[in-house]
Amino acid sequence: MRLLPIIGGLCWCCLLALGQAESGSVAGSIFDSAHAPAAGISVEARNLETRTDYKAVSSAKGEYTLVQLPPGKYDIFVINPKYGPFVRRGIVITAAQPAHLDIQLSSNTALTTLGEMPELRELLSKKPPPPQGPAPRVADGKPDFSGVWLISPSSLGGSSQQPDLLPWARAIYRERVLNSYKDKPSARCLPELAGFLARWPIRIVQTPKLLVALRSDDVISAHQVYLDGRSFPKDLEPSWQGYSIGKWEGDTLVIDTRGLNDKTWLNMFPHTAKLHITERLRRPDLGHLEVETTYDDPESFKTPFQTKIVNVLSPDEEVEEYVCAENNQYSQHVSTN
């Protein structure tokens, strides 16, 4: 009678071995942005047919192995707050041959993917150095931010903190990465968040009571900042660009923006209508405009986080009209489901 449990155990082991023999694996090493082995990094594989996810964690030496993968095509990805997202699509897994994939992680530029915009890189490479001299001032002695501005080459890599996302926001961000950002609002001619990141030329017009930023890369081409000492309306209706009030702290203009809706993307990150943006603008000299931005949304981020960029004065540039319906060639590839 003792043979029955033994035989049963042998049969189970045989079935388990057979299942492992019919599955595949992928292994490799993970390196951080300094090219050193990255330990404790979660790497995942998504079966493109079943949409099933498989997970492994890298060892102290940065090595990982994803096992028991049914044969088929997979997306292999790492989405970690410390690094930029890594996605390798369409990896073929077979039972006969283990796959190998080393993963090189990049530094996280958080709110800017500008380094991946070849058109912008080409434009900036042809720009002459910004003009030199002291920052101009208006009649009351405050710095004058007026002019046409474009992001500096030194800011292409970004100087930004990574938002520490709450679980619901992290899950949405993860899916946006895996879906190649196909539902990004701008792909449907919807507005982006206002701000002074000059990916393409922006013109700032400054008066004693109002500052206006004119853009050439968004559906809403003008963003108003009130400088007349007003307070926020009591019943602030959420809108695409929110409501912005500016106050001076010495030579720094502090812009407080509230009343944003939750429809825009903060680069690729989700946010709620609780999002509060604080921008600090400084013009240390004639040719440079420093922009430090703090994002606070307690319903999306565990703590506030900052970005820092520098724009350069570009008097040879113009802010041209932007007609999204004519320019948006990507929309035909976006799912309408």
Task: Give the label of every model feature segment.
Residues 41-43:
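Short beta-strand elements bearing conserved aromatic residues within extracellular beta-rich modules
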Residues 45-47:
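Conserved aromatic beta-strand anchor motif in extracellular beta-sandwich/beta-rich domains
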Residues 13-15, 25, 137:
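Generic alpha-helical structural signal
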Residues 1-2:
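N-terminal secretory signal peptides that target proteins for export/translocation
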Residues 5-17:
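Bacterial N-terminal signal peptides
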